[in-house]
Structure formats: structure tokens, C-alpha cells
């Protein structure tokens, strides 16, 4: 991944993520942290959401990241494709540490930490 894209992803904190089930797309927005090693996008999701149900079966995602304050004349953004990972306790601990260090208030909100491995951005 190019350094300019890594820097852009690292500077921002909201992503729009899309998943799909039976050719029906579904999108959601989330706060994220980024782990450069492995190109991992970490987010937290409430339990029993529609996107969590879809991602249980279909791990492929796509999404966008744009600045929180968009200037129409100079809009920039990153589009990505990736896959949801379920790689055990070590990844879960690393992802949780990354996410909660960026969003400590999220510790009191019920939900599940999820990890997207970016395959293209």
C-alpha cells in the first residue's frame, strides 16, 4: 500500500463499509483504528446488527474513507476492498488495544471488535 494512502487512512476515523448477501448490498458507518502492520482496519459493532449477521456468512467487504469535513472543491478519499478476519485471541487483543486507545469511550459500549484486512486500497 502506498505511503500516501496509509497516511490518509491513519489521519481519519470514520469508514463506510459495504457487505452483500444474495446480491443485496448493505452499508454501515463505523469509527475505526488502523494497524499499519498487516493493513488492518479495526471497528466495533453492536451485537445482532444486520451487517454482523451478513458478515457471519460473507466475509468480503468494500468501503470508503473520506475526511470528516469535506470541501467539495478538493474532495479526497480512499476506496478499499478487504476481508473480515477471525484469527483468534492474539489478533483480538492487538485490535482491541488499537481501537480502545483511539476511542476509550467505546469501552463502555457493548459490542464486538472486528478486523478487516485491507487487500486493496
Name each model feature, range by range:
Residues 12-47, 55, 63-65:
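Short beta-strand segments
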Residues 14, 68-70, 121:
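Short beta-turn/strand-loop junction motif enriched in small, turn-promoting residues
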Residues 1-15:
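Extreme N-terminal tail/first-helix region
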Residues 51-85:
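Helix-adjacent hinge/juxtasegments
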Amino acid at each position: 500500500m502506498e505511503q500516501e494512502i496509509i497516511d490518509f487512512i491513519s489521519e481519519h476515523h470514520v469508514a463506510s463499509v459495504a457487505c452483500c448477501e444474495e446480491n443485496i448490498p448493505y452499508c454501515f458507518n463505523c469509527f475505526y483504528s488502523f494497524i499499519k502492520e498487516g493493513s488492518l482496519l479495526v471497528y466495533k459493532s453492536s451485537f445482532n446488527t444486520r451487517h454482523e449477521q451478513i458478515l457471519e456468512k460473507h466475509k468480503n467487504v468494500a468501503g470508503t474513507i473520506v475526511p470528516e469535513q469535506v470541501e467539495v472543491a478538493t474532495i479526497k478519499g480512499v476506496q478499499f476492498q478487504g476481508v473480515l478476519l477471525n484469527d483468534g485471541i492474539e489478533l483480538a487483543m492487538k485490535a482491541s488495544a488499537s481501537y480502545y486507545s483511539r476511542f476509550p469511550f467505546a469501552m463502555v459500549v457493548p459490542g464486538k471488535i472486528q478486523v478487516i484486512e485491507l487487500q486493496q486500497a
